C-alpha cells in the first residue's frame, strides 16, 4: 500500500497519474476528490462527506482482495491510522510519500491556477489549516507507524528528497530544509530531537 500525501496544491495528483504507476507498478488510485467530482461535478465540496465514505469503502475492498493500491490524501486528519494498522496486519508493506511545499502561499497559488484550468477549488482557510496539520500528523502519527516513509520538497520540479526512513532508522539528506519543515509544528526544536521512530 502506497500513501501519496501533501497539502492541497502539492502535486499529489500529478504524481499519482504521471510518476507512481511506472515507479511502483501500481495504477489503482483511491482519491476522495475524484469521488467527490463524480458525485457532484459542479460543486465537489458539497459531496465531500459522501466521497470520504466511498473512499473508505474502496480501501476496504482493495484490502479484502489483498491488491496493491495508492491512497491520495492531505494527511491532515487521523482517519488513516486504522487503515494502516489493518493493512499491516494483513501483511501489507506500507510506504508513505509526503510532498511538502516551501510556503502555504505557494499552495494557495497552485490551487488558484488549478481552478483557472477547470479544476476544483479549496477554500483558502482550509488550505492553510491542512498545510500545518498535514506536517504535524506526518511526524506525530503516520511516519512512526508506516514501514517506510519519504519526505520530499515539491516546491519545484523535479522534487527533492529531504529525508527518508523506517521505524528503526532515518536518513536526513538536507538538514536545513528538514529543520525548516519540523519548525512548522515544533518551532523550539533543534534537528535530531523527536525524529519519527528512529536514530540519526
Positions of predicted regions on the chain:
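Conserved substrate/cofactor phosphate-moiety recognition/catalytic segment
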Residues: 16-67
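A glycine- and Lys/Arg-enriched "phosphate-lid" helix/loop adjacent to the NTP-binding pocket
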Residues: 92-140
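Glycine-rich phosphate-binding loop used to anchor ATP phosphates in small-molecule kinases
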Residues: 50-101, 134
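NTP-dependent small-molecule kinase module
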Residues: 140-191, 199-200
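Conserved lysine of the Walker
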Residues: 12
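The conserved Walker
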Residues: 8
